[in-house]
Amino acid sequence: MVPGDFVLKMKQGDSVVFSASTKEQSPASIRRKFNAYAAEAPHITGLEDQLKHCADSLISNHNGRKMICAGLSWLKTGLLRETLFSIAGLTLYAGRPEDFEEILDNLIANEEDRLFTKTTQVEAPLLMTVALQDYISSGADPKKVWNKYSTTLKKILESYLPGGREEISMQPDGLLWAQKYRTALTWMNAYVNGVPV
């Protein structure tokens, strides 16, 4: 055998349980786990079901708090920019409006520093307005949304006034200027030889 290969001759009617693990388990317990998972798995009949299932897989539960998983294993869960970009699609348009506020509230609680003070994702806090507009467009009561999130929105906008953030501020003409020595400040955050592209 070659490392990484598993070969088994089977005939019609055979049933095999294969598990690769660092701990030994009985085949019966593995089969029970598989059958329990298979029973809970959604019934997928087409592309729309598959998209909804994939969207559901990106919403995770961390210590009882729902968050959006950004990039599966290679990025953290609950990242500011990634959550604000994807929250409407993964909740509102996927038929899960009840998750929108819970995920957004968790994001606000976890990302206060980056929302109101400093971040290398200088445009990300402003995406909060887009997310809330999407929420209202999907049927949320504008007055309730304003009552709940107006303080957050005002703090975000005020943080862009001169002196509010080290890396970005509003200029006299109303435009935003972002600059910090040797630091990438937008979604284009690639570096070459230690210098942002």
Indicate where each model-derived feature is located.
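Alpha-helical support elements that line or immediately flank enzyme active sites
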Residues: 74-110
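The feature captures the catalytic groove of carbohydrate-active enzymes
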Residues: 1-4, 9-17, 114-151, 158-197
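Generic structural signal for well-ordered, non-membrane alpha-helices
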Residues: 18-19, 105, 109, 130
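A short secondary-structure junction motif
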Residues: 58-62, 107-114, 163, 167
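Acidic/polar, glycine-enriched structural segments that form the non-catalytic walls/loops
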Residues: 1-76, 142-150, 154-162
